[in-house]
């Protein structure tokens, strides 16, 4: 099974090459990173986004730091801190940096660069394989409900991961098994990841997609025979609470009201077993300009303030299934989540 026709992260000629997701779908442009600071800036400015992709990019950023600083552990540790500060919510970032730090602290060789490139590449490849596994496990759940429409939020495909996708990987696998009549993609304000990225990915793979306004989700669930809402995750607690793109919580509430199943697909690296309550997940807030402007064009009065949290937390009791490469947890709770540790 191929990963998809989309690739957002490449390592070539000792550079990290990122598809600039801010410019999609109108332009396919790339950003070449040759320093760890450039990688951190790319993460912060959302050139690359999606929890797994952020972790992968950060791992390559550590390798670039070794190209800059050699075996100077102090400077490498500061580079790790710079990368860790780029986005606060996605736990995959910190998971990947812990792996890279363990290699830095444990290696005895003078030249760390090839070792760190190898580890970053391994993280990248492991994510792709995890996504392929999740795709099949999630499609098995969809098969139990029968063929029908799916609804997804934000972007969880190859653009957000090492390839194939988490929630979008499930959708890809289900479509290949003729389980999907159509996909409804929320536009996902304010960055419009659904409109710009998910719709673009699905069109690239010739999967039928209908873009909807975020506010149309309830009507679509009520009238369009949606079988599953399928989303990704930026952090999952030990009890099964899920932090994901703002609007996910509302979709879970709507799905429960309309009798629609709600699935979260994410690699096990997204689970933070040291965090027990979703209330303790740090929620990133971004500038009000992201709400008040689109590509430099004002949408709101200049004097109007804006509140722009970019994640919310869906409690475990609203989730029907969490799908990881290690297995599936139905109706998650603390005891069931332990099987994924």
From Swiss-Prot:
Domain of life: Bacteria
EC number(s) per entry: 5.3.1.23
Binding annotation for substrate: 49-51, 87, 193, 244-245
Xref: InterPro entries: IF-2B-related, IF-M1Pi, IF_2B-like_C, Initiation_fac_2B_a/b/d, M1Pi_N, NagB/RpiA_transferase-like
GO molecular function ontology, one term from the record: S-methyl-5-thioribose-1-phosphate isomerase activity
Site for Transition state stabilizer, residues: 154
Keyword Amino-acid biosynthesis attached: yes
Catalytic activity: 5-(methylsulfanyl)-alpha-D-ribose 1-phosphate = 5-(methylsulfanyl)-D-ribulose 1-phosphate
Family per record: Belongs to the eIF-2B alpha/beta/delta subunits family. MtnA subfamily.
PANTHER family with a match to the protein in the record: METHYLTHIORIBOSE-1-PHOSPHATE ISOMERASE (PTHR43475:SF1)
Name under which the protein is recorded: Methylthioribose-1-phosphate isomerase
Organism encoding this protein: Hahella chejuensis (strain KCTC 2396)
Lineage, broadest ranks: Bacteria, Pseudomonadati, Pseudomonadota, Gammaproteobacteria, Oceanospirillales
Gene field: mtnA
């Amino acid at each position: 099974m191929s990963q998809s026709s989309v690739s957002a992260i490449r390592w070539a000629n000792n550079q990290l090459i990122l598809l600039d997701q801010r410019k999609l779908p109108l332009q396919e442009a790339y950003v070449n990173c040759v320093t760890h600071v450039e990688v951190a800036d790319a993460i912060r400015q959302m050139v690359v986004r999606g929890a797994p992709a952020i972790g992968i990019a950060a791992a390559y950023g550590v390798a670039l730091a070794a190209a800059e600083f050699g075996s100077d552990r102090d400077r490498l540790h500061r580079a790790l801190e710079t990368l860790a500060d780029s986005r606060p919510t996605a736990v995959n970032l910190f998971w990947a940096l812990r792996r890279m730090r363990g290699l830095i602290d444990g290696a005895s060789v003078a030249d760390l660069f090839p070792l760190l490139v190898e580890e970053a590449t391994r993280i990248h490849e492991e994510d792709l394989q995890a996504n392929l596994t999740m795709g099949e496990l999630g499609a098995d759940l969809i098969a139990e409900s029968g063929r029908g429409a799916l609804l997804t939020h934000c972007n969880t495909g190859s653009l957000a991961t090492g390839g194939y996708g988490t929630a979008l990987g499930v959708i890809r696998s289900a479509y290949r098994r003729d389980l999907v009549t159509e996909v409804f993609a929320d536009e996902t304000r304010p960055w419009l990841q659904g409109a710009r990225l998910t719709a673009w990915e699905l069109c690239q793979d010739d999967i039928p997609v209908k873009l909807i306004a975020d506010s149309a989700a309830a009507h679509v669930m009520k009238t369009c025979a949606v079988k599953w809402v399928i989303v990704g995750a930026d952090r999952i607690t030990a009890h099964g609470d899920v932090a994901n793109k703002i609007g996910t919580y509302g979709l879970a509430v709507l799905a429960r009201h309309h009798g629609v199943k709600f699935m979260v697909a994410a690699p096990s690296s997204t689970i933070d077993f040291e965090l027990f309550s979703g209330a303790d997940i740090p929620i990133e807030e971004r500038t009000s300009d992201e709400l008040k402007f689109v590509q430099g064009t004002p949408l709101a009065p200049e004097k109007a303030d804006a509140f722009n949290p970019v994640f919310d937390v869906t409690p475990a009791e609203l989730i029907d299934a969490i799908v990881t490469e290690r297995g599936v947890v139905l109706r998650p709770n603390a005891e069931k989540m332990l099987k994924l540790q």
